[in-house]
A protein has these predicted regions:
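Alpha-helical transmembrane segments of multi-pass membrane proteins
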Residues: 58, 73-82, 106, 111-112, ...
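Hydrophobic alpha-helical transmembrane segments
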Residues: 33, 48-53, 67-74, 100, ...
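Hydrophobic, well-ordered secondary-structure segments
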Residues: 70-77, 81-90, 116-118, 125, ...
Length: 156
């Protein structure tokens, strides 16, 4: 009996996630950014796909002076709190897998000091970032469980 309830719970969660995804409108600029220009809509590991999609923008940003790069990252964090909150609210789900703006910004922070021509370091940064994002070591796990809304999405 428990197995059936568990299967039903999984089916209900999957159905709810699909309903939430249908509430997205890529014509809405907040939704477009929150989904990483649509990369978060990947049916296969959207966080990983979103992290990969952040790399071309990082490459362009990597040629900026460090001060301007840092300013763009800080603005992206501030804007991200709002756009992730609004998109999650519109979807009716907190931190839906398709919301990957936090992965974009996290990758930009991870790769900030890496020269654009050091692709082995970019690959290593990607792997470390994804491992930490999936594992969520303390204190990130605490924030993930206790901080809600756009701030919770961005900080995890």
């Amino acid at each position: 009996m428990t197995i059936l309830a568990s299967n039903n719970d999984s089916a209900n969660k999957a159905k709810g996630a699909e309903v939430a995804k249908r509430r997205l409108r890529l014509s809405n600029p907040w939704h477009l950014l929150a989904t990483g220009f649509g990369s978060g809509l990947s049916p296969w590991m959207p966080g990983t796909v979103g992290s990969l999609a952040a790399i071309p923008l990082w490459y362009l940003m990597s040629f900026l002076p460090l001060e301007l790069y840092s300013l763009l990252v800080m603005l992206s964090i501030c804007i991200g709190v709002y756009l992730c909150h609004q998109t999650a609210k519109d979807m009716g789900v907190h931190d839906h897998g398709s919301i990957v703006w936090d992965e974009f910004v996290g990758m930009w922070i991870t790769l900030m000091a890496i020269p654009a021509d050091k692709w082995q370091w970019v690959a290593a940064g990607f792997v470390v970032f994804r491992c930490l994002d999936i594992w969520k070591p303390w204190p990130i796990r605490w924030f993930d469980r206790n901080v809600h809304g756009g701030m919770g999405i961005m900080i995890d």
